[in-house]
Design a protein with these regions (language model features):
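Hydrophobic (often cysteine-bearing) scaffold residues that line and stabilize catalytic clefts
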Residues: 14, 48-51, 96
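Short pre-active-site segment immediately N-terminal to the catalytic Zn-binding motif
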Residues: 1-16, 46
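Active-site metal-coordination segments of metallo-dependent hydrolases
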Residues: 37-53, 66
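Glycine- and acidic
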Residues: 2-5, 34-41, 82-86
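Alpha-helical transmembrane segments and their helix-helix packing motifs
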Residues: 28, 32-34
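Short, mixed-charge, low-aromatic patches
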Residues: 11-12, 54-58
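Long, well-structured alpha-helical subdomains associated
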Residues: 44, 57-119
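Active-site recognition of the HExxH zinc-binding catalytic motif
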Residues: 15-28, 52
Length: 119
C-alpha cells in the first residue's frame, strides 16, 4: 500500500486498502480463490480485478464513504479487459459479485464483535 499521505483523502485510502484486502482474501486459508493463472492470463486477471473492485465498492458502501480516486493510466486498460470478460461471459458479473461478497464477509469476520451494550 502506498503511504496514506499519497491519497487525496481518507476515503480514497480506504477504497484502495479494501481493494488490496480483497486480493489478500484469495489465499486458500481464507476464502480460497484460485489465482494460479493471475499473472499468465489477462482474462483471469480481469476476473480477479473485478472481484477486488466490487469488494472495495461493498466495503465503501458498508462504511458509507464515497471515495474520489485519482485516475490512473492503467484504468482504461483495466476497464477494457473487464468489458471483454463481461461481454464474453454473461455469468461473469454474478460470479465476481459472489466472490466479492465472500471476500467482504471474510473481512467482516475479522472485526471484533461489539458487546450488546455498545450497539
Amino acid at each position: 500500500m502506498p503511504a496514506f499521505e499519497s491519497f487525496r483523502d481518507a476515503a480514497s485510502y480506504v477504497a484502495v486498502l479494501a481493494h488490496e484486502s480483497a486480493h489478500w482474501t484469495a489465499h486458500p486459508n481464507r476464502v480460497g480463490r484460485d489465482l494460479s493463472r493471475y499473472s499468465k492470463d489477462r482474462t483471469e486477471r480481469a476476473r480477479e480485478e473485478l472481484v477486488a473492485e466490487i469488494s472495495a465498492a461493498l466495503v465503501c458502501a458498508d462504511l458509507n464513504i464515497t471515495p474520489e480516486l485519482e485516475p490512473r493510466p492503467d484504468h482504461t486498460a483495466y476497464i477494457q479487459t473487464w468489458l471483454s470478460v463481461l461481454s464474453n461471459d454473461r455469468r461473469a458479473i454474478f460470479q465476481a459479485a459472489a466472490h466479492a461478497q465472500r471476500a467482504v464477509n471474510y473481512l467482516h469476520s475479522l472485526q471484533p464483535q461489539a458487546d450488546a451494550g455498545e450497539k
